[in-house]
């Protein structure tokens, strides 16, 4: 949400339960648009099968790289649907960033995407769920400081990680 053009965070989110893309699907996107930055490649791939009336997809219509792909297979359609759902969610949450406290935004993301349930179902799920809850608590405490906003919160968490602070 902070900056979709960062390749590693974007790839991590796309392969997480949020995007639910497989390694093969990620490779399909990259090979379809090898000369575009990854964010633009994802957008261009999604636009191949996107609905022009879709608000989330319409935000990325500027990218028109050539993939040389003629296929409209079921696999492509499934990937397009995943990307459409992902970009719709991103557009929804990004629209809320300027006026929603970080802890409320995190809580909504966790609840509406099913991320909390997904984390709880993983090995050591109870500990993982506790870590997610702690992140929301840290966001709430952060909102009480003089700093505000998602960008500053991401930097704050980065500093905690950098100095190996147990949060």
Predicted segments with their positions:
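Conserved helicase C-terminal RecA-like lobe
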Residues: 1-167
């Amino acid at each position: 949400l902070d900056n979709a053009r960062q390749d590693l965070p974007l790839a991590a989110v796309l392969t997480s339960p949020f995007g639910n893309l497989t390694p093969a699907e990620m490779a399909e996107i990259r090979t379809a648009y090898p000369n575009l930055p990854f964010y633009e490649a994802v957008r261009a791939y999604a636009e191949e099968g996107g609905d022009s009336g879709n608000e989330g997809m319409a935000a990325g219509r500027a990218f028109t790289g050539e993939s040389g792909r003629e296929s409209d297979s079921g696999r492509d359609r499934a990937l397009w649907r995943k990307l459409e759902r992902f970009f719709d969610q991103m557009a929804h949450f990004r629209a809320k960033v300027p006026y929603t406290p970080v802890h409320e935004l995190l809580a909504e993301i966790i609840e509406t995407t099913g991320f909390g349930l997904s984390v709880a179902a993983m090995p050591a799920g109870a500990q993982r769920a506790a870590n997610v809850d702690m992140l929301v608590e840290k966001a709430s405490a952060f909102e009480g400081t003089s700093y505000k906003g998602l960008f500053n919160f991401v930097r704050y968490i980065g500093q905690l990680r950098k100095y190996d602070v147990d949060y």
